[in-house]
Curated annotation (Swiss-Prot):
The lineage of its organism: Bacteria, Bacillati, Actinomycetota, Actinomycetes, Bifidobacteriales. Pathway: Amino-acid biosynthesis; L-isoleucine biosynthesis; L-isoleucine from 2-oxobutanoate: step 2/4; Amino-acid biosynthesis; L-valine biosynthesis; L-valine from pyruvate: step 2/4. GO terms for biological process: isoleucine biosynthetic process; L-valine biosynthetic process. This is Ketol-acid reductoisomerase (NADP(+)). It comes from Bifidobacterium animalis subsp. lactis (strain AD011). It is an enzyme of class 1 (oxidoreductase). One of its GO terms (molecular function) is ketol-acid reductoisomerase activity. The keyword RNA-binding does not apply. The gene is ilvC. Binds 2 magnesium ions per subunit.
Length: 350
């Protein structure tokens, strides 16, 4: 069955008339949501801790800023955009004690709702609008009159207006210009984690690292190995993004295509490992492991960060990336995105 997709005419901004929307967090997604909604005529307040470095950034953009409890107390819709591991504490300490009866809760990722770390009472609508792109792109596309696609879901709908709220929010974000795909909190969470762990990060990163090590261990120059297993990956991904697997194969030489078809690096054993990791996502084992580690001060996470930040390919990577002038433009994009909190990956209510 084809997915249901909504566009501009399917959302009604008037649904948000007379409602205040609190954006909790002003990181990568937070700044884009707050500014796009504000520019769409929505009454927006940003919720941050009083000592957050993001307070001044938000005020400089002309946004109203209050503490998280204050923002939650006056909002009709609360979009929580802090990292997964912090949302439970923010909910329990700052939002749940202050939230208005019947106020809607919104998320850009289903993790905490799906795994039960946040359990709103049944009188609160709960919906999700999850952009398929980083915040600075969401903002840039909105300003350009375009939009970034989103996936959207409704988990609780006590009044029957959950979808109206979700689509109105998506329209204010600029997302309906591109399209909003209907999903569920379960589907979004589990597929998102699966993609990260098995393909986008846990797959590609490890393929690149191992390919580099095999070539350099065999005596090839690190610089040449880097070009072959890392640099050229962008070309393939761009082709795939434009026209799928067929375009990326069609665009390569016959020799490259044949090598693709007969390669045995990814085989049924890989499928079995993917199925194992999917099971851990589905049964909550991965979520529990991650959240337990975070609650203990993240010792395993920090150990792994340190271990993987010192991989051999990064001994040569910075020098070679600097050879390509367009990487300087990419760095500017990253600086712009990071300027709100320091690091996209650490965007939080701090």
């Amino acid at each position: 069955m084809a997915a249901q997709i909504w566009y501009e005419d399917d959302g009604d901004l008037s649904v948000l008339d007379g409602k205040k929307v609190a954006i909790i967090g002003y990181g990568s997604q937070g700044h884009a949501h707050a500014l796009n909604l504000r520019d769409s005529g929505v009454d927006v307040v940003v919720g941050l801790r009083p000592n957050s470095k993001s307070v001044e950034f938000a005020k400089e953009q002309g946004l109203e800023v209050k503490s998280v409890p204050e923002a939650a107390a006056e909002a009709d819709v609360i979009m929580i955009l802090a990292p997964d591991q912090y949302q439970k504490g923010i909910w329990e300490n700052d939002i749940e004690p202050n939230i208005k009866p019947g106020a809607a809760l919104a998320f850009a990722h289903g993790f905490n709702i799906h795994y039960g770390y946040i359990k709103p009472s049944e009188d609160h609508p709960v919906f999700m609008v999850a952009p398929k792109g980083p915040g600075h792109i969401v903002r840039r596309e909105y300003v350009a009159g375009r939009g970034v696609p989103v996936v959207t879901a409704v988990e609780q709908d006590p009044r029957g207006d959950g979808w109206d709220l979700a689509l109105a929010y998506a329209k204010a974000l600029g997302a309906l210009r591109a399209g909003a795909i209907k999903t569920t909190f379960k589907e979004e969470t589990e597929t998102d984690l699966f993609g990260e762990q098995n393909v986008l990060l846990g797959g590609v990163n490890k393929l690149v690292e191992m390919g580099f090590e095999v070539l350099t261990d065999a005596g090839y120059q690190p610089e040449i190995a880097y070009f072959e297993v890392c640099h050229e990956l962008k070309m393939i991904v761009d082709l795939m993004n434009e026209g799928g697997l067929n375009k990326d194969r069609w665009s390569c030489s016959d020799t490259a295509q044949y090598g693709d078809y007969v390669s045995t690096v990814i085989d049924e054993h890989t499928r079995e490992r993917m199925q194992y990791h999917l099971q851990r996502i589905q049964d909550g084992s991965f979520a529990k492991e991650f959240m337990d580690d975070q609650a203990a001060g993240a010792p395993k996470f920090k150990q792994l960060q340190e271990e993987y930040s010192n991989v051999r390919i990064e001994e040569v990577g910075p020098k070679l990336r600097a050879m390509f002038s367009w990487n300087n433009d990419a760095a500017k994009d990253a600086d712009e995105a990071n300027s709100f909190t320091g690091k996209i990956a650490r965007a939080q209510v701090q």
